[in-house]
A protein has these predicted regions:
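Acidic/His- and Gly-rich active-site-bordering loop/insert found
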Residues: 12-163, 172, 183-188
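Acidic/histidine-rich catalytic neighborhood of metal-dependent amide-processing enzymes
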Residues: 168-219
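N-terminal acidic, proline/glycine-rich, low-complexity intrinsically disordered segments
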Residues: 1-6
Length: 219
């Protein structure tokens, strides 16, 4: 619904110009979004072991100008549920390091602290939170030649971990949203929090982020 007088959409009070920029921005980031989704798919990591995934997300958000918090700053250690044994965590952390995880943020995530929260603020206004899951399932991905990820070279290389529930896309979409918001930061008033949640499978990760008061200020 749009006012012909001022060109303002009733949806979120956005002007036609801003909506057009949102649409153009979404189209512009699509190739990068696809590439990142396939990268996350190829290096699938299950709950509390998303070390590579979380570290690369954090690095890209910092590069986009977001205020980024990770690790124990966004996860209450005592509220985490279903955390793997220490030897499993350490093996996954070492694998993430070998597979190109960001060194700075890998340190913060070590031990199963794989949450990321990015904030972008510009002036007074509401605080909106958007959540994105990042974990894979404990499954073995098919390597049959007709399986599209296998045929196109992005099937999971990590045995026993596969993105069969779309969280590779969730994570990539979150970064796509971040890129569009960064471009529009001077236009939109208020605060946006992008919450990249680990261990969604088994409903294990949200409690620890809530306990860390990540969403206390979200309207």
């Amino acid at each position: 619904m749009t006012s012909e007088r001022d060109g303002t959409s009733a949806t979120f009070g956005l002007t036609r110009r801003v909506l057009a920029r949102l649409s153009a921005g979404a189209l512009a980031v699509t190739p990068t979004l696809i590439a990142e989704r396939r990268d996350f798919h190829r290096y699938a990591e299950s709950g509390w072991t998303e070390f590579r995934t979380a570290s690369l997300i954090a690095r890209r958000l910092v590069d986009l100008g977001f205020d980024v918090k990770v690790g124990r700053d966004v996860l209450d250690p005592d509220a985490r549920m279903g955390v793997p044994d220490v030897d499993v965590l350490e093996a996954a952390w070492g694998r993430a390091k070998a597979q190109g995880g960001d060194p700075e943020f890998l340190k913060e995530a070590r031990g199963g602290f794989t949450g990321v929260v990015a904030t972008l603020s510009h002036g007074a206004g509401p605080t909106v939170g958007l959540r994105f899951d990042i974990d894979a399932l404990d499954l073995q991905e098919s390597h049959a030649p007709e399986h599209r990820p296998e045929a196109e070279g992005f099937a999971s290389v990590n045995d026993g971990a596969a993105h069969a529930c779309g969280h590779d896309a969730h994570a990539a979409i979150g970064l796509g949203v971040a890129r569009v918001l960064a471009d529009l930061s001077s236009t939109v008033k208020g605060t946006v929090k992008l919450i990249f949640q680990p261990a969604e499978e088994g409903v294990r990760g949200a409690k620890a982020m809530v306990a860390a008061r990540v969403v206390d200020d979200v309207d």
